[in-house]
From Swiss-Prot:
InterPro entries: TERB2
Source organism per UniProt: Homo sapiens (Human)
Record's protein name: Telomere repeats-binding bouquet formation protein 2
Annotated family: Belongs to the TERB2 family.
Gene name of the encoded protein: TERB2
Keyword Lipid biosynthesis: no
């Protein structure tokens, strides 16, 4: 699953999840060399250093909640878990995000929190390691592709996603409003042609006085 990928782990991430990452073919590295940055606590000093870094400020780094790995471990289809659902924003933004869209996905699934210490058993890790070794040749073929599917701020490869109830209310901020919340208009749709139907179109330059334009139009 993570063959050849490098991950950095905050001190807030459990050893079980780190072992799962390695068992699935991933390696652990420092944050500068990592393809993925994982944390379970946005207020942890390790994670705060990431948020305060130039890479993060310039949008060249993204922190993900490490329970993404737990979701992968418990999923019937490993690549069916969308990484983007687990973006971990700075603590100062989380209250406002919860107010607008509800709790984060890892907060809703109490299974993650209750079974934190037994998410991945030693036997499961052994099995995963064996499966990872069997899949090595296949992964090598994939790595020859000219496309790089994972970068510092990952662009998640195309994969099967399962629908979530009340999406995106029970997920992260998407930046898009639901179609159900949009105002509805009845009647026929017509092309807008400037100068017809009593409407005109104007190009408004920067630093222009809108009040002066309105007064000029009224005088006409």
């Amino acid at each position: 699953m993570f063959q050849g990928q490098r991950g950095w782990f905050c001190g807030s991430v459990s050893q079980d999840l780190r072992q799962f990452w390695v068992a699935e073919g991933g390696t652990i590295s420092d944050p500068r060399a990592a393809d993925f940055l994982f944390s379970c606590d946005a207020s942890h000093p390790d994670t705060l250093r990431i948020y305060q870094s130039l890479d993060y400020i310039e949008d060249n780094a993204t922190v993900f909640h490490a329970y993404y790995l737990s979701a992968v471990a418990n999923a019937k289809i490993k690549n069916s878990v969308a990484l983007g659902h687990f973006i971990l924003p700075p603590a100062c933004l989380q209250k406002e995000i919860r107010r607008k869209i509800g709790s984060f996905i890892w907060e809703q699934d109490q299974h993650f929190l209750i079974e934190k210490h037994d998410e991945v058993t030693p036997n499961e890790i052994k099995t995963l390691r064996e499966n990872s070794e069997l899949a090595t040749e296949h992964k090598k073929e994939l790595s020859k592709s000219p496309e790089k599917h994972f970068i510092r701020t990952p662009v998640v490869e195309k994969q099967m996603y399962f629908p979530l109830q009340n999406y995106p209310v029970n997920n992260m901020v998407t930046g898009y409003i639901s179609i159900d919340a949009m105002k509805k208009f009845l009647g026929e749709l017509h092309d807008f042609i400037p100068g017809t139907s009593g409407y005109l179109a104007y190009h408004v330059q920067n630093e222009i006085n809108m009040s002066a334009i309105k007064n000029k139009l009224k005088r006409k």
